[in-house]
A protein has these predicted regions:
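Polyanion-binding surfaces on beta-sheet-dominated domains and ring/shell assemblies
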Residues: 1-117
Length: 117
């Protein structure tokens, strides 16, 4: 899997984790569900299903407007993060971290934005 370096550490993107999952389990399922959505805050759950068996879950929370990307895409960002975490819990792309490159990049951006305030 292709790695991205962020602040000196290697991370795997969610898209790379999904591609690897599809290679390993072409009939596997990645199911997502909104668990809560109110006042600009959203919580997603992602489930990884292999051969009809739930093998991993992941959750992610985002707040609308809490970062540059979340001003317009907090729903998509939360769903992507939940998928990345679920695939990580399944063991895909976790050589250096359970967090995906997407999550870490967003966190770094958020820290920079918070510092500007």
């Amino acid at each position: 899997m292709e790695k991205i370096q962020i602040q000196g550490k290697d991370y795997i993107t969610v898209s790379e984790r999904v591609k690897e999952f599809r290679k390993l389990h072409p009939q596997g399922q990645i199911l997502t569900q909104i668990m809560a959505n109110a006042d600009g805050q959203i919580l997603f759950q992602a489930k990884i299903i292999v051969d009809g068996v739930l093998v991993a879950t992941g959750h992610a929370y985002e707040k609308e407007g809490s970062s540059f990307i979340n001003k317009t895409s907090h729903v998509e960002n939360s769903e992507t993060s939940a998928i990345g975490r679920a695939l990580g819990m399944y063991g895909i792309g976790i050589d250096t971290s359970l967090a995906s490159a997407d999550e870490v990049a967003n966190a770094v951006t958020q820290q920079k934005e918070d510092f500007k305030l």
